[in-house]
Design a protein with these regions (language model features):
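PLP-dependent aminotransferase-like
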Residues: 3-104, 111
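Conserved active-site segment immediately N-terminal to the catalytic lysine
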Residues: 91-135
Length: 136
């Protein structure tokens, strides 16, 4: 849907379930992992901006253990590198910057700054695997 494919890069956290990175591999894009912050399980938000290149199309923050990411910092990182963004299709052109696609499988029902998960990122994915908060 977002037109990500070979030659593109997608930033994912190093601390996540394999499915987050696997979807990037399945479309032929390059997986770019960003490490966690010291003494934390959260992505090191300062490193997100450092990882963005002209090939970056998506940043995939992962909400963990019912706690949503600091989306203010994620969007700040994306905005700080807006000039590097090279859209490849109409959806990407409409955003004019790297797209934020949240993996909120572990945050179903969580809130961040009075906004429900699913309302904060540009797009949000949920999983219904047996070990997730909402299983099928």
């Amino acid at each position: 849907m977002l037109g990500v494919g070979p030659g593109d890069e997608v930033i994912v956290p190093a601390y996540t379930y394999t499915a987050t990175a696997s979807v990037v591999h399945h479309v032929g894009a390059k997986i770019v992992m960003v490490d966690v912050a010291p003494d934390s399980f959260e992505t090191d938000y300062d490193r997100i901006a450092d990882a963005i290149t002209e090939r970056t199309k998506v940043v995939m923050p992962v909400d963990l253990g019912g706690v949503m990411c600091n989306y203010e910092r994620v969007f700040a990182a994306v905005e700080s590198k807006r000039e590097l963004f090279r859209p490849a299709n109409d959806i990407q052109k409409a955003f004019g910057r790297v797209i934020v696609l949240a993996d909120a499988a572990h945050a179903f029902g969580a809130r961040w700054h009075n906004r429900m998960c699913g309302e904060v990122a540009d797009f949000t994915s949920f999983s219904f695997h047996a070990v997730k908060n909402a299983s099928s």
